[in-house]
Curated annotation (Swiss-Prot):
It comes from the Eukaryota. Expressed by the venom gland. This is U8-theraphotoxin-Hhn1c 1. One of its GO terms (molecular function) is toxin activity. Residues 1-21 form the signal peptide. It holds the Pfam family Prokineticin. GO terms for cellular component: extracellular region. It comes from Cyriopagopus hainanus (Chinese bird spider). Disulfide bonds join C23-C35, C29-C44, C34-C67, C54-C75, C69-C81. Keywords: Disulfide bond, Secreted, Signal, Toxin. Transmembrane segments: none annotated. The keyword Disulfide bond applies. Belongs to the AVIT (prokineticin) family.
């Protein structure tokens, strides 16, 4: 019984952590993060580092597969961050 209780407690804590990262807009995310994902499941994600997946910045700040790159990096045509 104790094991079931511990497993349930860990599961609830994990779900709370996932929910706390959800976002509706860029304003919901901290510095260095963007709001990205599908219409039904957006999460705050870190800006892309060198070689990581990215999406070019856009005026609407709407991203589906990844965030823009960190400063001094640009998003290449293959959606990977690289030196500008």
């Amino acid at each position: 019984m104790k094991v079931v209780l511990i497993v349930c407690l860990v599961w609830v804590m994990a779900m709370m952590e996932l929910v706390s990262c959800e976002c509706w807009s860029q304003a919901d995310c901290s510095d260095g993060h963007c709001c990205a994902g599908s219409s039904f499941s957006k999460n705050c994600r870190p800006y892309g580092g060198d070689g990581e997946q990215c999406e070019p910045r856009n005026k609407y700040e709407v991203y589906s597969t990844g965030c823009p790159c960190e400063e001094n990096l640009m998003c290449s045509v293959i959606n990977r961050c690289q030196s500008a």
